[in-house]
């Protein structure tokens, strides 16, 4: 089975969210930022203080953003 390479860099994921139409809705405690989409339901929370995102957290972000893993 082939491995899909998903970027786990915080800046790149933030750029992907912005490119998909997600807008910064609010800043949470510490370096956490919540993104909101004008059409899609829910919010995506991203820790902007970390350089890399753990795989499980990244997968959760993909689910919240309604992206295919």
Enumerate the predicted regions with their spans.
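Basic nucleic-acid-binding interfaces
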Residues: 1-31, 36-69
């Amino acid at each position: 089975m082939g491995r899909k390479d998903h970027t786990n860099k915080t800046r790149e994921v933030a750029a992907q969210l912005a490119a998909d139409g997600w807008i910064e809705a609010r800043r949470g405690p510490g370096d956490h930022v919540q993104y909101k989409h004008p059409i899609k339901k829910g919010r995506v929370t991203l820790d902007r203080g970390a350089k890399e995102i753990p795989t499980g957290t990244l997968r959760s972000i993909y689910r919240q953003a309604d992206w295919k893993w």
